[in-house]
C-alpha cells in the first residue's frame, strides 16, 4: 500500500475545491444567461425587439466593409403583413407551426442522421420558433452547444409568447439578404411595395430565399427559385396560420 503524503493530500483537496468553485462559477454564469434571455422574451410581451443578434453582427460587418451601407429594417404590425407571405413561410419552413410546441422531432432526428453521415453539422431541422431563437440571441455558428442553447430558448419563447406573437417577431426579424431584415424591408427591397401588398407568387419567391438569403439575393431569378416557388405556391392553400388569423 502506497502512503499518501500530507502535501499530496493537501494538493488534492485544493484541486477539488478549485474544481467545485469553477463549476459553481460556470453554473452561475449559465443560469444568469438563461434568466437574461427569459427576461428579454417576457419584455416582448409588451414591446417589440429593437434588433437581433444577427442584425447587430451584420451591422458591424457592413460598417467595416461598406461604411455607407445600413441595415434595412422596418417593424410593421402583424395585420399589416400579407397573409400570402404568412402562408408561404409556413408552407416552406414549418408546416405544423400553428400546432407544434416549437420542435419537430422527426426533422431533428433526420438532421442528426444527416450530420452523422457527413461527419459535420450540415442540417438543423429547425422550426420557425427555433429559427427565431437563433436569430434573436445566437450566432450563425453551427455547433451542438449552440443547438442546445437554441432548444432552450425555443422552450422559453413557446412558454411565454403565443403563436401569433412568435410569428409576428419572426416576420419582422428574419433575414432576406445582406442587411435586409423583416417582411417590410424585403418587400420594399425586392418589389418596391409594402409587405401588406405582397401577392402569392411574390411571397412564394421570398419564402424560397430563407435558407440561403444572401445567395438568392446574389442569384435572383434562378431556375431553382422559380421551381421551388411553384411548389410552395401549391402548398400555401393548406398552410394553417395561428388560430387568431
UniProtKB/Swiss-Prot annotation:
The keyword Kinase does not apply. Its main location: membrane. The chain crosses the membrane at residues 20-42. It catalyses: [GlcNAc-(1->4)-Mur2Ac(oyl-L-Ala-gamma-D-Glu-L-Lys-D-Ala-D-Ala)](n)-di-trans,octa-cis-undecaprenyl diphosphate + beta-D-GlcNAc-(1->4)-Mur2Ac(oyl-L-Ala-gamma-D-Glu-L-Lys-D-Ala-D-Ala)-di-trans,octa-cis-undecaprenyl diphosphate = [GlcNAc-(1->4)-Mur2Ac(oyl-L-Ala-gamma-D-Glu-L-Lys-D-Ala-D-Ala)](n+1)-di-trans,octa-cis-undecaprenyl diphosphate + di-trans,octa-cis-undecaprenyl diphosphate + H(+). SUPFAM superfamilies: Lysozyme-like. Its EC number is 2.4.99.28. Peptidoglycan polymerase that catalyzes glycan chain elongation from lipid-linked precursors. PANTHER family: BIOSYNTHETIC PEPTIDOGLYCAN TRANSGLYCOSYLASE, MONOFUNCTIONAL BIOSYNTHETIC PEPTIDOGLYCAN TRANSGLYCOSYLASE. This is Biosynthetic peptidoglycan transglycosylase. The lineage of its organism: Bacteria, Pseudomonadati, Pseudomonadota, Betaproteobacteria, Burkholderiales.
